[in-house]
Every structure is written in C-alpha cells, then in structure tokens.
Amino acid sequence: MASPTITERPILFHSKGQPSFQLEGVVHTPPAPQQAPVAVLCHPQPASSDMNDSLTVQIARSLAEAGLIALRYNFRGVGKSQGQQTDGRLEPLDLAGAIDAALLQPGANPAKLCVIGHAFGAYVAMLYAPFDQRIRTLISISLPLFRAASGFPRVFERPKLFVTAEFDELCPLYKLEPFVENLPGPKGIKVIVGARHLMRGYEGPAVEAIVKYVKNWVNMPGV
C-alpha cells in the first residue's frame, strides 16, 4: 500500500481591512491532520519574488512532511492577488487574512500557530506579530533591519528565531546580534554558513534549521 502523501491545494482568501483584496495562496496539508500545528509563510520582496520562491516552497513542503498545515501566499499586487503593493505599509493586513484562512483549514490547531517570514516577508511579520495573540512563535529569515531604522512600533515577546546568512549584505550579523539581544522573551540566532541574503544555494541548511526549531517548539507545552 502506498504511503500517505502531502497535498498541495490552491486557495483564495481575503486580506483584512477596507478595502479587502482577494489573495491567492497554496495550502500544504499532511495526511489526515488532527490538531495539526499551523505555519503561515510570507515571501520576500514583492517586486522580485512571490510565494513560489524556492526557499518558501521548500519550507512549506518540509513542514507539511513534519505534520504541520502550511500556507504560503502572495502579498497584494503579486501574481493573482488583487490590490497594489504598498512596500510594507498595508501588507500586514494580508498576513492577518492569511492567518484567518490557515486556521480555518480542517484539522488545524489554533493554539499552535507559527509565522515565518523571509526578507521583506520577515519585516511584515515583525510588524504584525506583536498585535496578534494567535501567533505563538515567529521565525525571521534574513530580516532587513534597514527597513526599521527607527525600530518597530512594538516587539514580539514570545519565542522567536532569526535565521541569517553569514554574508548577508543587507543585514550583517554585527547589526542583527545587538538587535536580537535587546528583544524581550526567548530568542535565538541561527547563522547559515556561506549564504548571502536570499539564501540561494543554501536552502537545504536553512530549511533544516527551521524544521528543527519548529519541531522543538511543537513539543513545548503551553508555548
């Protein structure tokens, strides 16, 4: 008998706020999910990337293989998602809508929600996460700190992991380390040796680090 397989299904949902825009996404689902943890993935810079970014897809598939329901989606103005890009000003409303859609998936466990952002997506996730109590942990990949030169309006106090490239040209480690050190709550940094900002060619080590962190988080009671 063939082993159960992961399913990948396109979905449409709406951003929060007014006007509300229809957004497109892909849900990765493990076989027969029951109280499955949920991950929502935010892709890099909309001008040059989308939800089909190699690292984003690999993370979603690997998390589904690990038993999570994973949703990756296109920000407004990207692909078939309606609206216009706003360079991070309104994209947090897209993430809010994506979380709503992800938690409505059959078998989803609303008490175990992880948000993962890559580059621009990490910036959007950092902006939004402190305002949504449903988010239990946050993973930021290649966070572009230059976008928040004056800091973030609020900070996420729950567990968080920062995955960074050894040679990140937009957010070097010497800038990321003091930023993370000053954040409240549990936090950690994972350096992907040899990688640059977008992790091209280093997706494997990045995915491995993220899946390991998520598995540990899933098994933490009350987190």
Predicted region positions:
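Short, surface-exposed "cap/lid" segments of acyl-processing enzymes
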Residues: 32-74
